[in-house]
Amino acid sequence: MSAARRTVPTPPSGGQIVPLRRLDERRASLAEISDEALLASCGVGDPAALGALFDRHHAAVYRLISRLLRAEPAETDDLVQMTFLEAWRSAPKFAGRGTVRSFLYGIAANTVRHHFRSSRRRRLAHEGIPEPLPSRAPDETVVRAQQIERLSLALEELPHDLRAAYVLCDLEDLPGVEAAHVLGVRAGTLWRRLHEARRALRDAIEGGTP
């Protein structure tokens, strides 16, 4: 996976967000401000606050979107931009339930879901065809590589709701209650989706084990 690009979004007002690293005169003060305070500042139109939030969280948001949507880096970067611009617009709605990162994760998950619906694109197909297994028993390294490849393919084939539950809980290590809040579902619904996702992935790995 390509590294997240640090292209800072421009807020709807048209003023360029200035990354934290460029705000020498405010670096110390911004570094000491909590995420919640920065988000509140976004809510009253402070572009520097959004720049600081972007610097703190863009890598995590990029990683999450990359796991939810297998796409070209430029497309993923566009969705990251959309996520932070929506955070700028939605900042006044933050009610303090959960962390600011989970707030951003929720926006990112919705952005990906809307992307699926609006574009109606199919998942990008993997290039190339896996080579057939050798006639002799493969060594442990080869078997492990094949299992990882099957897991990656199976994760892409999961319905979006199941994949989102698995990514948030098992890859991002979010607590169940927080992951449910991010996805806007009840805890029971989250656990059902996570159970189905884990079972599907386990079957994909075990079903192809030599």
Task: Give, region by region, the residue ranges found by the protein language model.
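A short, glycine- and basic residue-enriched loop/turn
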Residues: L68, D77, A91-R97, R101, ...
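Structural recognition of an alpha-helix C-terminal capping motif at a helix-to-coil junction
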Residues: D78-L85, G98-N110
